[in-house]
Structures are given as C-alpha cells and as structure tokens.
Amino acid sequence: MEDNDQQYSTADNKATIAEPAFRYNAQLAQDIEQRWQKTWDEQGTFWAANVKGDLKDGEGRLACGRPSFFAMDMFPYPSGKGLHVGHPLGYLATDVVSRYHRMKGENVLHAMGYDAFGLPAEQYAVQTGQHPRITTEANIANMRRQLHRMGLSFDDRRSFATIDTNYVRWTQWIFSKLYDAWYDPDFVRKDGGKGSARPIAELVDEFKSAKREIPGFADKKWEELNKVDQADVLNDFRIAYISKSPVNWCPGLGTVLANEEVTAEGKSERGNFPVFQRNLRQWSMRITAYAHRLVEDLNTIDWPEKVKLMQRNWIGESHGASVHFEVECADGETRDLEVYTTRPDTLFGTTFAVVSVDHPILGHVPEAWEASVPESWKGGYASLKEGLAEYQAQARAKTAKERTEDAGAKTGLFTGLYAINPVTGAKLPLFVADYVLMGYGTGAIMAVPGGDQRDYDFAKAFGLPVIYTVKPLPDSGEKLEDYDGKAPFVSHDGIVINSSVEHTYKLGDALSINGLRVDEAIKKVTTWLEAAGVGVGRVSYRLRDWLFSRQRYWGEPFPIVYDEDGVAHLVPDSELPIALPDVPDYQPKTYAPDDANSEPEAPLSRNEDWVKVQLDLGDGVKTYYRDTNTMPNWAGSCWYYMRYLDPNDAEHMVDSDEYDYWMGTNRPGKEHVSGGVDLYVGGVEHAVLHLLYSRFWHKALYDLGYVDSAEPFHRLFNQGMIQAYAYTDERGQYVPADEVEEGANSGVGEPTFTWHGETVNREFGKMGKSLKNIVTPDYMYENYGADTFRLYEMSMGPLSESRPWNTRNVVGGMRFLQRLWRNVVNEETGACVVTEDALDEKTLKLLNNTIAEVTVEMEAMRPNTAIAKLIVLNNHLTSLPHVPRAAVEPLVLMLSPIAPHICEEMWSKLGHTKSIAHADWPVEDSRYVGADTVTAVVQIKGKVRAKLEVDPNIDASELEKLALEAVADRLGGKKPRKVIVKAPKIVSIVPDES
C-alpha cells in the first residue's frame, strides 16, 4: 500500500477539518484508548486468578492451571507534583513484560500500590497546610488517574496504599512478630543453614530450664528476676528491641535517621540538614544478626552485579580478631576493653588506644591526671573530669562526617587510664577522641601509627611513639626508609618486622612473627590470642542495626504500650491496628539545623488522651502509655509485594497457598533457589535502603515460618533515567524549556537557542519542576495519545541506560502507528482492508524471522530493538499492493504489549472478539527462519570497496578468496600485505604499497 504520510501529517498530530474520519491522530487515539480502558475495567481483562478466595475470577478463569508470573514495580510515593514523563519508564517496561507473558499463556500478577507514609508525604502536607491524609489521598487519586490513562495492565482489585487501615494492621503485626522473636546463631534452619529467628517464648523456656545461662544473672533462676530485669534480659535478644545508644539526630527535621538516610557528608538525605550523634532511647532492628546471610544469599538471586556489590560494600564483611585489653580503672577494678581489628599482626606496633566519647569505660576514669602526664595530652584543661565532660559535649555537637573526616587537626584527651597489651605487656595510654564512633566496631581501637594514617597523625600531634611492623616486599620497588619518621607504611602485604617477644604478657611464652608475610602473621597471632584466651578470630560487619523509630506523626504507630515501671508490652493482635489519632498539631518540632543539644519531641506525645490507655493484658485492667514514636516509611515498603497476593485477606498477612503459587520455590519451570517475585523493576538508588531492609524482614519471616522462600525478589532490573535539557538566561535563571526555540548553527558545531528573542544556555540533566523542563504524561496523552507515548519511551534506547527526552522526536513513533493503522483500516470508512492472500516467499521469511527475533528481544527486555524490527516488517507490508491478514495479525500481536490500545482496536477490526491481551503470542515457522545469504563487506584501508552476498556458513578461506577476486583491480595485481577475515560479514585488506 502506498505511504502518504506527507499528505496529512500535522505538527501537533491533531485532527483538522480536511482529515478523513478514521485517520489515526491524537484525537482518535484518545477515543480509542479511553474506550478500551473502560472495556478492560468492565471485563476484568487483567485480573489475575488466585488459587482460592475472592480473587479467582476475571478473564483469567481457570488460570491457576497455568504457570504463574509475578511482575512488579517499586511502588511510588504519591507526590503532590504528580508524574512527569521520566517516572513511568520502569512502569511501562514492566507492563510490556507482563503483557508479553500473559500472551504466552501465563497467569500474570501485575498490580500497583502506593508508599504513602513517611517524610515526603508529611513535608508536602506541612507545605500546603493540610492534614497528611487529605493531601496523600488526593495525590494517590491523581497518580492513579495518570497511570490508568497510560493503559497499564494492572489488576486494580489488588491496589492499596500503605496508609490503608487493613495494611497498617499487618505492618504492625509483622513488627510484633519481630519483637517476639530472637536470633539463635546456632539453630539449624529447615534449609540446612545455620542461624535462625525463633520465638522469644523458646528463649524464656531455655532460661527457665537452665539450658541457657541468664546473662548478668548466672546465679539466679528466671522466676527470681523481677519483671524489669526480665524485660532487660529479653530486650538484649529481641530482633526488634529498644536501644539506648548513639543515633543520628537531625534537628532540622526534628527526628532521628537511620545510617542509610545520612549522606557521606553527614547530612540528611532529605533536606540536606546536619546530623549529629546523640545517645537516645530508640527502637532498633537487629539486622546485623542477618549480615552473613544477606551477603551469602546474594549468590542465589538474579540481580545486577553493581547492586550486589553495593549491598556487599554496605554490609562490609571483614575478617579479623577481637582482642581484649586489661584496663585498671580508678576504682581499682580491672575492666575489659574489647577491640576489633582486621590486623592482629600489628599488636606489636600498637603504642596507644583510643575510645569513643560515648564508651562506657569513661565512667571509670580518675578525678585528676598524674603529675607525669604531658601537657599536650591534657587538651589545655586543668581538670580531667571537667575536660572530659567538655570534650564529650564538643564531639557530640559535630556531625559524624566532621568527626571522622581526615582533614583538620586531630583532637583528643588522655583519660588517665592505661590498657595492657596482651602480647607485649606494654602500658598503652588510653585516649578519648572524636574520630572513633561508638556505633562502629566496639567503640575502641588499638592505634598502630606505623601502619595507619589517622593513627600516625594522632601520634604526631600528641608525641606518641611510632613503631613500624611491616616493611615493603623486596620486589615492590619501595623502601621503609622512605617512610620512617615521615609517614606510615600503609599496606595489606609486606614482610613483618619488629614483632617478637621472649615472654608474652598472658602466657609467658615466646612469640615471633618476624619475617612472615602479613597473611601468615595474622593467622599465627590469631591462633595465639585464642590459645591465651584474650582474643578470637571473627567476622565483623560495617552494617549497623537498623534504627527504626521516628519522631514524626505520619507513620505507623508502634503496637507497644508501657506500664508504670516502663516495661514494654505488645498490644494483642486482636487490638490491631493501632490507628493514628486525628490531631490538629501533627507537625514535628524542628529546631535550628545546628542545634545539636535539642531534644526530640514526637507529635503523638502531645495527645494525652491517645497516649494514656486502659487495657487488660492478662492481669486485669491497668493504665498503660502508648509509644509515641512512629515507624519509618521503610516499614510499609518492606513487605508490600506479598500483600498484592490478596490485599483483602483478613486472616493472614499472606496465605501460604497463594504464596506457594505466586512466589514459591517449587513452581513448575521456576525452581529458583530463592523463590520470590519473578521480576522486580526499580531504580538503583534503592540498593541499600528498601532492598536491604526487605531482604532482612523477609528472611526473619522465613525463619518464623510465615513465608516459604528465603529471598523476596528473584530477579531485579534497574531501569535508567530519562533526562532532559534545561535552559538558563544570562542571570542563570531557568526558563520554560517548551518556549525555547532552536536556531541556526553557531559556527562551532552547536545550534543556538533563544527564549523570546534572548539567547539562552542549554544544559543536560534531570527533569524537574524547578528546572522548568517537565513534560507530563497528560500533555502526551492530549497531543499524541498514550500509545505513542509508550512507543517513544520504549524505543529511546536500552532500558537499563539513561537517555535524553526530546518531545520533537515523538512524532516518529506516531507516524509508525499511522502507517500500521492504514495497513489495517480504511481511513475514510473505518473498515478493515486486509486480504486473505497467501504470503509470498519474501514476506514469509521476513515475518518468521521477525517473530523469532522479537521473541528473543522481549525475553531479554529489549523493547527498543523489538520495535525496530517491527518497523522493518511494517515497512515491507506497506510496500505490498495489498496487506495480507496472515502477515499483519502477527505484527499487531507483537506490537500489542507496547502499544496496546491501537492494537486492541485493530484486533477487533480484524474480526476477533477476545481481547488481544489474552491472544497467543505468535510462534515462528522454523522452515522460514534464517537468511539464505548475508552481506559481506570488503574494506581496503578501512573504506568499503565491495559488497558480496554469501552463504552465512561460508568459511574464512572461501570468503577471503571471493573478496580478493572482487577487489583485484584495486590491488593492482599485488598480493595484499595483510587480510583479516571475520566470516561471514567482514574482510579487511591492508594493501602492499611498497
């Protein structure tokens, strides 16, 4: 059929008076799209059939006999700004995959919820002066409308928000199970692994039966402990527990933050406010108990390597030893100072020790320094006690970044105490310094200035000795003399020196590691430490326990109440959910960003009627006090994927039968080691927050028997980012990108850009409201239609890569759809124009090769290359006198996951009554797959001089012979100096020019 694009294409793709009634333009696209979206909704086209319950109907009737496929996106925050065209990239990709698998005969679960608690929603409500629930629900409604208009094939029965009452109930229920659980590192799991969460009642039974010694009360029976002591003992074991330790306090936000929410610069991830270390009583999650499993099980899941690496680095597994130093305190008692080091071989070079300003040993320092203490060790203070108190206050007023950064002078204070080196017996002066943090390791370090830059700088500042214990390898080209007295020799390999003693402090035996390589020395010293009872080899992790409290209003309340003695009690499951009270004052109390001494005040604490409650927890009605903190926004997103299986289930967090069918480890054809969601699509920015937290919660629920797989997400795919040009005037102010005009080339290879006649500068980066370069999906729907929008986003490049948005390029996708439409539909009458003609040989081969190739591209999530192949096929059909049904129907089927509305319309006009969403994906006829010939390019000095049609199986020698014959005249009868053959497509010739 003849292609007459230029006769009718308009700049804005809108219909004009002269256009035929059934020409595919933006207006017709909108009519088609909205009509089919209504039909899909009414017929339940995308309803996925459950094993049982209310969700087993829809067009997927009897679908539970089919294999399952669970695809999902990282659900969005319901922002007040709504969506711009960059947001749906992942949603569209997942939708294409879901539609493809549906056409392969699988029962596809694809749904969308909303992550509605937390700081983003609360801050938007504060800005608008409205209650968070009002603004959040309005934002959800707008976002749901935008997504629906996109034609995403969600099962809308499964949609929910994390603020929904029934959802909050189960989030609180999960917390209660983690509170009522402890981690037993020696327990053998059902999968044969070691270490598991267990019910706290089993721990109590072990205490009662004396099977396990009660920490701190070895001489007492469990029944002899009062309830406060019992609660304290259990708190030290619980997975969800109350901690009083240094936390990240952010005065500017009025709340504490998890480590993962603090940037490398020591600022809050949201708002960029300073963050300070404070000792506060907070809820924490014992994620560190799962550190090893979180690392090891990365090997069982199909995730991008960069995300796995980010999680491994964040968890920070290291191998070393715990070493115990004796410290004689001011009260005459000898106390233990535990240090973790990855280099126990350097004990011979340890010349002092340092503790954090929050280390408990500082409660046992003397009143004053001895007369022999150097003035440089006193920090200018006359009194040790007063100096220590002031130094601690100064350190706590700094951010973690300021305390640990290498730049600047090293500060510290001698504590008046000495630690005894367990190997050499040397008395090591014990300092307190701000660069050691209590939240990392043990809050104490053994300082080795000969091998560590910070220790070296500290030693120089305080006049402490430097001992080198490692020298460079002989073939390294380095000499220790180049470092001696000038810098530390920092190396993980080398030859050990200055490391021997005739009589060790602890055992009195001789110990020497001189002459050994570092790794051998580490092993030998670790063995000695264990034999001496002053150390043990162990694995340590950078990962800290997850701070789980927030002093905010807009979050899930904890299902916890406190009695008159301050003992925490779980609210019974029958009382869940604990709802947020509607309070007039929900804004957090914030402070000046640098007010490190400010105190958190939770908004819920202001509502006394809600805080004070009468409950019967088994021993009569008593007065209790609710916990006034709320959970972080990560709580709701930790487990939402499971609620898609049945968001209306009032009896279970997730039903075991539904879990086995949708996420189990023994599904036919999907015997994954990990089980879990088949495909999870989202941004890489969530690698160490949401993804790590979800894996942790899931493993705990797995241990406790609530789920049947150890991992939540089997395959993870990170989409790239859609970026855009922004424009600034001479003042550096952003101007509306859609009002900028592109002018002539400036003469240096770049076009010029003007805004209302004024020259502006172009920059490339993110799309955002402040940059005035946002394009909304609503604009695309109105001016091009949802299918053109979908087609453009999917054709822009590989899904995993970032790409620039350019509205001017959208028209290319529109023209492709117009050409395809004309191949099926008469623009004047709307009638179907395809014929029943048989396919010629050329069309048969092109069609079947296209089916084979597009299937491969869809499996690999490469819709951009699939689209390119479909365009080639459509162009061929356009060149035919008549378009045969046998060729165009497979084309429409293959395009339908990408442009579903227009394909539904064409499928209907082709005479089909069943939705194309459930039509069978085409299968190629292998007799017509594979090319008869391929084009071989012959190059001389990099320039193409001939093209040959050859057998795709031709060998290199035959291809070389044909190529030389084809360019013989250009070689002037001479043999070439070199011939490079890459059969069957390239021959590169280097001529002999001598």
Q: Which residues fall in each region the model found?
A:
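Helix-rich, typically C-terminal accessory recognition domains appended to large enzymatic cores
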Residues: D115, D186-G193, D236, Y241-N248, ...
